[in-house]
Amino acid sequence: MDTATTTCSAVDLSALLSSSSNSTSSLAAATFLCSQISNISNKLSDTTYAVDNTYLLFSAYLVFAMQLGFAMLCAGSVRAKNTMNIMLTNVLDAAAGAISYYLFGFAFAFGTPSNGFIGRHHSFFALSSYPERPGSDFSFFLYQWAFAIAAAGITSGSIAERTQFVAYLIYSTFLTGFVYPTVSHWFWSSDGWASASRSDNNLLFGSGAIDFAGSGVVHMVGGIAGLCGALVEGPRIGRFDRSGRSVALRGHSASLVVLGTFLLWFGWYGFNPGSFLTILKGYDKSRPYYGQWSAVGRTAVTTTLSGCTAALTTLFSKRLLAGHWNVIDVCNGLLGGFAAITSGCAVVEPWAAIVCGFVASWVLIGFNLLAKKLKYDDPLEAAQLHGGCGAWGLIFTGLFARKEYVNEIYSGDRPYGLFMGGGGKLLAAQIVQIIVIVGWVTVTMGPLFYGLHKMNLLRISAEDEMAGMDMTRHGGFAYAYNDEDDVSTKPWGHFAGRVEPTSRSSTPTPTLTV
């Protein structure tokens, strides 16, 4: 702030008042004072806007960093022969998602004025005149794009190790350009039919569905889309034996899984607290130093407690069920707790977040047992984790949302959590959200995946799947075990029959790893 232009000059003001005692001088002095106060007010408004915009940009950077977390998590969860493929698909999700969200997705999500189903204002397509609108800036687009590609990244994990590259390109563009934006319009836009932020206060059940940072909008959308794709494709070769018993196809690197988990954990502090969009906003004038910045801190705490509780619950639960301590299960449990708390992170107490994480862990364990029983194959447990825990998170918000926090964030006297004495209206809205998300994603992504399947554009051949896509589709392995694995010095046929060196001898022999 330029203090020279916002500070009254005592010399100038003294000269005006001492030169004459008539009303003209008094008016001049008053005009001078008012102009200075106006300048100060404008500067403070600019500063507030700049701080809020910087906060949103920083949050967008954190959410985007989650893409690296997704990439590492996916890479570690698949077999070594498909590492390059899955990392390339994560890059593709971000790149294709950026173009489709820029051209169509952002307008479908937040184009206003519009109807309750989908945004349609022309100025939002390709950001044609978006920044010229009052209160809008490019930072909001960047933040929402980071959310959109997160949903696409979730889906890629469910269909890993058996999907053609062109299918990734098609589904990623469609999901980020149409399917996800429509859902985000319903629940986050000021015009959305079920949004808790509707400008006309014509709210679903008098409350709207509270999905603060996207347990449903992001996690359920990505998880259900992945479920559709995995069901159409079927399990990976070797995932179940001839008698139908489950065969573990373990990922090749627990180190990458842990690295990816910590990167996602770090990014979640932009995902959840960043969803306030602004930070310089006061709440209760009777409480000094209390405002939106306090709610941001509380949201970070509830996010942390839910994830950590889910991780610990999964650790001991899986020890009892499986007889060993499994770091992969703990990482997935942690992420399940984060996915669940994302809906109500801003409107619940810290103690309630512990309840959320505890239940989320068992939701994930239960859905994994069900998936095994139904012979459903999801290499990253994405549908169970994001879809199942995301649905629990929406229900949790309907049960535990606190009245004071709901009224701070959403205007008016709203219904709040059932277990907090607020009745069942909010819970009803949350259940409606679960139903419509499952229905919408199923009727859009299901036919897309089925159409790709019928056109032979979805699943790779059995030969490619057995050999590994790194070799057959991407020109080499992600790891060079020794000089003989350097494809730059050997013809392709030398490697066609082997994917990974065995550990039984110092000289690798041709083997197929499933």
UniProtKB/Swiss-Prot annotation:
The modification Phosphothreonine is found at T472. Its main location: membrane. One of its GO terms (molecular function) is ammonium channel activity. Belongs to the ammonia transporter channel (TC 1.A.11.2) family. It is a multi-pass membrane protein. It is found in: Membrane. The keyword Phosphoprotein applies. InterPro entries: Ammonium/urea_transptr, Ammonium_transpt, Ammonium_transpt_CS, NH4_transpt_AmtB-like_dom. The chain crosses the membrane at residues 56-76, 91-111, 140-160, 165-185, 212-232, 257-277, 291-313, 328-348, 351-371, 380-400, 431-451. Ammonium transporter probably involved in ammonium uptake from the soil. Gene3D superfamilies: Ammonium transporter AmtB like domains (1.10.3430.10). High expression in root. This is Ammonium transporter 1 member 2. It holds the Pfam family Ammonium_transp. Keywords: Ammonia transport, Membrane, Phosphoprotein, Transmembrane, Transmembrane helix, Transport. Signal peptide: none annotated.
